[in-house]
Amino acid sequence: MSGKTTSNTFEHKFSFYDLFELQKENQQKMLELGKYHEFKSPGTNAVPIDDVKLMSYHIQQLMSEIGEVLDADKRWKNFRNLKYDKDAKLEEIADCFIVLMNIAMFSGFDGDQVADAIAKKALEVYERLSNE
């Protein structure tokens, strides 16, 4: 996975699978370093794994990240509030996607399963809208 940056873009476009695998490596390293010692269940040592404590932890983290998206763009709050930090909003949206990958990993799903589920759901919506 070569992804050198040139300004704000990557030379290599990562697939969903590449991103999921990279995040899986990050989570594996966090387990090895003991970063989740208060949250992981006994026997949690490799991802993906179905671990309700870590899944729950990441759902709570997702709620925090969603709040940060809303904080970066306050235009939703009322029509007078003009706070909008586009770069910060994009970074927080990326954090949300990363945390969603963690939720999937700690629910026992791999990248292929998640990608297939997303594609299936998107196609269902597309077909439903096409038939309206």
Regions found by a protein language model. Give the residues of each.
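Flexible "arm" and connector segments at domain edges
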Residues: 1-132
